[in-house]
Structure formats: structure tokens, C-alpha cells
Amino acid sequence: MSEPNQQPYMRVDDLHEHAASSSDAPKKKKKRGKWLAFFVAIGILVVCAAIAGGQFFGDTAHDGPFASGEKNVVMIDVKGEITAEGDTYNQQFILNQINEAKNDSDNKAILLMLDTPGGSVYECDEVYNKLLEYKKETKRPIYAYCESMCASAGYYIASTADAIYANRNSLVGSIGVITGQFVDATQLLDDLGVKITTVHSGANKLMGAMYEAPTEEQIAIMQSISDEYYAQFVGVVADGRGMTTEQVKALADGRIYSASQAKGNGLIDAIGTIDDMDKHIKKDVGENVRFYHEVYEQSPYASLLGGLKSAIDSRSMSSELASSVKTIEEMNITEPMYLYQP
């Protein structure tokens, strides 16, 4: 925020300086309040306009058949961190695309285009099951192409494919789970003079809170959950790749593999370009197919609203404190994640 304009000339008088500085403070407060009200008003207008136009959540696929009238292969992007909604990933958009392909009698296959470090266990398993439903009900194949990265939850989803290709520079794998990454911010809060008291019942109700150091019991609880989701991941890969659980566990220590290593270990079928993948698909389903590719784009209204929120938040605390809080929030993981996190 810019400072109020100063008078070009001032009398060097202690009393006058004191009076000027005293009257300056409420002006600053008043001006800050006006700016905050302005941002809030703009935000409300943006939300109202976006909802009225049906564009708040970004472009989404229609939950019905493409009705394309020609044989097609639907290309579905799985890009960015897998979560409910992000700049490049939208869960409902992907689920709707799968439904569209399933309901289109002219559809011949799905091609997954993967470039992701992974993400939420819930979202990736939901996509995984929706793809299995597509295969079961249509008897059509699924293919997967790994671009620069196909890690963790991304590879979990790719395991549904009948054939997995990867770019020669792709990183593949990271079969593992992060269930708890506790950030103990108690010392930071003490340094800031912040005291938090939460009234609760249940010894582990505050498990994962940044203002409570985790106990040994809580770490053991999260480890048991982590082991359960790890076993689920191993089972998914074993089913998809025709391997035993022992074979998968030998590879599933969380590490990432190069494309050549992944192929050597049976995690992918071939290394090649997207053109090579296309040729493979056409050989399976026929030459006369059109590749249908619908790209998700986040609504500009949602992006603008996010920018306004950030601007308001940054005005309410120092930039250094805001940066520290954001970093701590990103580090704290209290839900199961199939995520490659170097």
C-alpha cells in the first residue's frame, strides 16, 4: 500500500510534527479499510458473475456420449498434482470424460496422457475404479503414455492400461505412500507469541495439528494406515502388470525409475514417442480412428478470485510471515498421498 502523500514543506516544530503524525495514523487505517472493502466487493462481483455464467469451476466435460459419429480414441490428460481441482487437473472433468467415452458407441479406446508427480489417494483411486468400470462395461482397451513424469498416483492410474508407453526421458514409478508428514511449529508459534488452546475429547483428536508435537502413539497410528494404503498400491500394480505382490514389493520402495529401468523391471511396455503410441493403438483398434482431445482450462474467474484472495491475505500480514505460513501448510501432510516428493 502506498503511503499518504506528504506535504512538500513542513515547519520544524516538535508540536506540529507530533500533531501531523497523530493525524496520519487514522488516515492510513481508513485508507487500508477502503482498499480491503474494494477487494471484497470485487471478489463478490466476480463470484456472482461466474456463478451466473456457469464458469466458476472451469470448463467441464458433459456427462453423456460424444455423439461424434465417427470412430474415436479419447485422450484424457492426467497432468499436475492429482487433487480435487487445480490449475491443470480437475477430478470431475476427468470422471465426466470417462463417462462420455463409455457412453459413446463410436468410441474404441481411451488414451491416458500422464505428466504428474501423483497426489491424493482418494482422487486417484476414484479415477482408477472409473477406468476399470469403463473396461468392464465396454470391453474396450485403455492405453497410457508417460510424458516427463508418471509417478506414484499417476502410475497407480496408469496400471489400468493394456499397454504403457513412456518417453525415453520420462521418470516412472515412486510406488509408495506418504501418510503423515507432521510439522511441529510449536517453537515458531512461541517465538511469535501465539498461544493456541483447543478444547477437545479424545487423546488423539488433535493428531496432525501443527501446534501439537506428535506422540509415539500417533506416529504408530499413521504408520498402520500407511502400511494399509501401501498394500493397496502394490495390489493395484500387481493386478495391472500381471506380477506377483512379491515382485512388485521388490520394486516398490518409493524410488523413481528412468524409462529404461522401468521397462527392464516390467513397469512399462515400451519406450517411444507419442506417435509410436498412436501407431500401436491404430494397430489394435483400426486405422480409421480420430483422436479426440479435450483440454481442461481453469476458469479465468476462479484464477482472478484466487489472485484477489492472495492480495487480501498478503495485506493482512507481513510478506515474511505469509511466506512462512504458506511453506508450513504445504509441508504438513495429514492424509494419505501417493506422491513423489523429492
PLM regions and their residue ranges:
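N-terminal organellar transit peptides
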Residues: 1-141, 149-150, 163-166, 181-342
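Zinc-dependent metallopeptidase catalytic helix centered on the HExxH motif
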Residues: 161-179
